[in-house]
């Protein structure tokens, strides 16, 4: 009887202290892909908030194209789209505020510039060169410096064209430049690093036995961001990037469907 009770107590202790099954301590970063505000999926962003509460990560990484910035695109524009870019920036800052409120003290928050955000510098270069240096950059527009001065987190911004600016352990996180059928394999062969990227809105994971690469889907509302009447093959997803004390990284891919996901064996939904 005593042996049986001892086994029950041990199992209960492990259940309530899952870190005892993990071995050496890990840091975990929540990785969020393309949002395309104002065409983001509201269920997706709320789900991210809920997952932050559930896993208490050490940081958050947004892979770029957080904003759609259609207003300054060179492509033809839907006349029914009437949002101002300033309004979209404010909406994205509200999302960041919601996520950061749930993150622990001194969490690292990395915001990457995507090709959609880089439209701002391209627009200035192409249409109003004389305003170069007068229009605020994205770090200013998103209040990165102010957030670092008065907030409880460490905020970082990574320019689009510095592909290896954001590195966590032995993993490079980038927005992405390629857009072909087997894009994860393309990036693996090109960079020869562990790589997580967005851009394509598709979920692909590939490994050569030494390194791995992952195209981490998206978090947008597909009916608003897709520009084709046929199926896209897109997939909403979230990444959990784990890094050990030696800087070795592993990635858990969490697929998202209609505001639902399974994280560490538990279904979370909004």
What do these predicted ranges mean?
Residues 1-40:
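Acidic, histidine-bearing metal-coordination/catalytic regions of metal-dependent phosphoesterases
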Residues 108-115, 158-162, 252-256:
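Acidic carboxylate-rich catalytic motifs and surrounding loops in phosphoryl-/glycosyl-chemistry enzymes
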Residues 17-18, 46-49, 96-98, 159-162, ...:
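A generic local structural motif
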